[in-house]
Amino acid sequence: MAASSALRLILGSSSASRRQILSEMGYQFTLLSADIDEKAIRKEKPEELVVALAHAKADAILEKMQNNGMMKEIVDSQDTTLLITADQVVVHDGVIREKPSTPEEAREFIKGYSESHAATIGSVLVTNVKTGVRRDGWDKAEVYFHKIPDKVVESLIEEGNVFYVAGGLLVEHPLTSPLVEAIVGTIDSVMGLPKALTETLIKESFSEP
């Protein structure tokens, strides 16, 4: 489904890779960020955690829209407005990893990917703003790396992008992409917005409440 004047999309994310993927899918969209305390939400299973976080982000953005007048504009409009929120964690050796908070943590995370594979668990939630219909799902992918040299690890930490992604896992970066041995799943899932799942949820969000 291509973007049209009757469909308005809001991407509730500050992630550059999610913006890139949604653009690749042929959609035009506006951006709003949730600004929530992600560490305040805890779940034992990674699948439950990422779905809960996507819902929390949607709640925060809808409240923001209510306060700034966007919600009234949407309700009065003939257009369908969909809000897309997403979250992702990395699971490595059975441990859930979110964004690294220190250089030491980032170093430990990235070096670990030389020893055993990482799994990405990513959620997508599409909220039909006018009807309140919500459709969510999650997707999983696995990433296998060759040995990541210490020099690459230090360059990534110095550059800083690793602190903005789950598990400090960057597969599309020029320094790390040559070191990826295999991906089981899709690259867009690893990057935080699985295209097939997103398309499915967009279609489903048009259903009756």
Language-model-detected regions and their locations in the chain:
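Cofactor-binding loop segments of dinucleotide-utilizing enzymes, especially the Rossmann-like FAD-
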Residues: 14, 34, 129
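Anionic-ligand binding patches
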Residues: 2-10, 23, 47-209
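NAD(P)+-binding Rossmann beta1-loop-alpha1 motif at the extreme N-terminus of oxidoreductases
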Residues: 9, 16-28
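Short glycine-rich, Thr/Ser-proximal phosphate-binding strand/loop in the N-terminal lobe
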Residues: 26-43, 134-140
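Generic detector of contiguous secondary-structure segments
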Residues: 13-16, 41-44
